[in-house]
Amino acid sequence: MNEQIIEINLNNLDEKYEFNKIAKQASGAVMYRQGKAVLIAAVAVDEKAVEEDFLPLTVQYMERSYAAAKIPGGFIKRETKPGDFETLTSRIVDRSLRPLFPKGFYYPVTISVMVVSSDSEVDMQVAALHAANAALYVSDISVQRSIAAVRVGKIEDELVLNPTLSQQDESVLDLLVVGSEQDIIMIEMRAIASEKIDDIEMDMIDPMMGGVPLILEHQECNEVDNEALVDAIAFAAKAIEEASAIYEKEFTPVMRTPLGLSLAEEKVDEELYAYIKENYSEAVAKAISHMAKSERSTELKKVRAQIMEALESEGKEADKELVSKVLDRYKTTVVRDMILDKGIRADGRGLDEVRPITIETNILPSVHGSCLFTRGQTQALVTATLGDKKDAQMFELITDKNTQSENFMVHYNFPGYSVGEAKFIGAPGRRELGHGNLAKRALEPVIPINYDGTIRLVSEVLESNGSSSMATICGGALALRAAEVDMVELVAGIAMGLVTDGERVAVLTDIMGLEDHDGDMDFKIAGTRNGITALQMDIKLGGIDLITLKVALEKAAQGKDHILDLMEEAEKKMESSQALPSTEHFSINPQKIADIIGKAGATIRDIIEKFEVSIDLDRDKGGVKLSGHDKEKVAAAKEHIEKIANAPVRKQMQYEVGKTYVGKVKKIVDFGIFVEMPDGFDALLHISKVAKERVNNLNERYHEGDDITVVVMEQKGKKVELATPEYLA
């Protein structure tokens, strides 16, 4: 295999693909370059298929520290578990490439993407998608389609294709679309809040203010309306169609000889299918009417047992696995036919109907803010905890040399018992991180941009029958309100579904787990009354036209507004939590911040211990934030700090070099004695200048509070050096 290099300049990306250069024993591999970024993508396949009817695909996106000329921090100097960005990127690549595999392909496949050189301007998610796609397309697995990824930003009201990371900082839209020449496969979107300065009419300027206009700022959530979103997706789709066609044309000559792996045939025993349809249609319809997954599974097992018993009594073959497969196929048909033929869903709802919702707030007395949000048989207990700046999550990005901090976190937990399964509760998996990230993207635009503390939302999914991430968003918004976070708007989330037979199309509002499993689309939308703040869409049927997308968005808006009505009613009945911390914000002279901190932090530590408060200081602006559980102690701490700040500035006393003074021993340390001089200023008597002979233990000679005679040897500003008369004798 000869090395082949393909360069493609498209959609504001300059890409170089180097094939047959690295990892030649893999099924497919590529070295991908964009700017200074270099990624290695490799695909491997096990030629022994699994027995289960699913594709065992594993995607790993990995960032190496050396790619940014860094050594891993901490005690372990090698890469360990993946960070959140790596996990979320792995998930995006998986969701984008999984639909490319042919039906009946049940062979274990691993796709590994490794960043070996970084670039501070390169979008690593788009780069990872393109590198993984190239390695898969040219592999001996013989995938027939290539995908392309496009990120769309909006800067100064203009849509921008594949903005650099610097441009993304200026954008109010983050839209990632992945698709092939024929279809859109995956969409992720989030709105990005910004601050806007209001224009003040000249005749509104108060002459008493000296004719100087006031600067008024307010936060724009930058929600996206339906029409603007469809336009942005259409803008991305056009670029994807062109790019994927070019990728296929350029990569096809590099494709390896196919392995010729056989695909599992999806055989349906037509006779058994007809038998079940004729004799058990009512039993199946009754079984699927149970909304809970565990109950439905139990009822379907009973139907299966009845079928097997009947077949055996008639002298027919009754293979348990075969009956289960055919019964599951018939169940799916029943669910879909009810929707398309009658406009009725398995639980009896209409297509546009939202499940019953109940909301309880601040049900946990020791928590800052809480909400128990129940929609049908999906239930989330969401809590909000408020902290200081020091509570922010610190992390690193391979594209940035500086340590990052995250002061708004959403953690989503999905225990097995929420779906009736006996599972050990361990560390969060990819799905939990993904759902938490979706909820964060939905809520972040309404959190004050300049929020000066830290917020942690935790969603405990107690029961799940679809849309648990959307319940997290709804419960999270109300938990934030319960914690008295000054949010711009309430946010609600709703999951939409789609069922089609190619001719007829039914859009479903607020889908449950059964409809997610047997439907053709999972479309999660969250936002305020003004528009969409976050969206996630995975399409199973191969594509979606813009007309159907518009219908889904309109129906989602109706469902979202209905949920917001209920949330607003719950907010009116909300009572403040007794556990909320008391906070005080005020300003002092920035030059006095050093006095508040004190030497080596002694003063601020004393304040924290005495008044049981936490303190955040802004050294540049003189801002002070106090937090504590006792309102009176917080007020007393404020008074104490203001007293220090308002105290007159003492001028540093000028001591006469060579003159003898009597001071007090303030503190004894290993290297000397801190002496309180006349007028209260401190000076250092070094251990080497206590006596002519070597002194090993100062505590044998002096005690704190003792008077001590010293001679000033030197003074440089506030730094005063001393010696004893004994040393100078």
From Swiss-Prot:
| Localization | Cytoplasm
Q: Which InterPro entries match?
A: ExoRNase_PH_dom1, ExoRNase_PH_dom2, ExoRNase_PH_dom2_sf, KH_dom, KH_dom_type_1, KH_dom_type_1_sf, NA-bd_OB-fold, PNPase
- Cofactors demanded by this protein: Mg(2+)
Recorded coiled-coil stretches: none
**A Pfam match:** RNase_PH
- Molecular function in Gene Ontology: 3'-5'-RNA exonuclease activity; magnesium ion binding; polyribonucleotide nucleotidyltransferase activity; RNA binding
Q: What is its main location?
A: cytoplasm
Query: Could you tell me the superkingdom of the organism this chain comes from?
Result: Bacteria
> Which Gene3D superfamilies does the entry link to?
GHMP Kinase, N-terminal domain, K Homology domain, type 1, Nucleic acid-binding proteins
Reaction(s) the record says it catalyses: RNA(n+1) + phosphate = RNA(n) + a ribonucleoside 5'-diphosphate
* Residue span, KH domain: 581-641
Gene Ontology biological process terms, A to Z: mRNA catabolic process; RNA processing
Q: What EC designation does it have?
A: 2.7.7.8
Q: Which UniProt keywords apply?
A: Cytoplasm, Magnesium, Metal-binding, Nucleotidyltransferase, RNA-binding, Transferase
Q: Mind telling me which HAMAP family this protein's record contains?
A: PNPase
Q: What does this protein do?
A: Involved in mRNA degradation. Catalyzes the phosphorolysis of single-stranded polyribonucleotides processively in the 3'- to 5'-direction.
Similarity field: Belongs to the polyribonucleotide nucleotidyltransferase family.
Q: What is this protein called?
A: Polyribonucleotide nucleotidyltransferase
Organism of derivation: Sulfurovum sp. (strain NBC37-1)
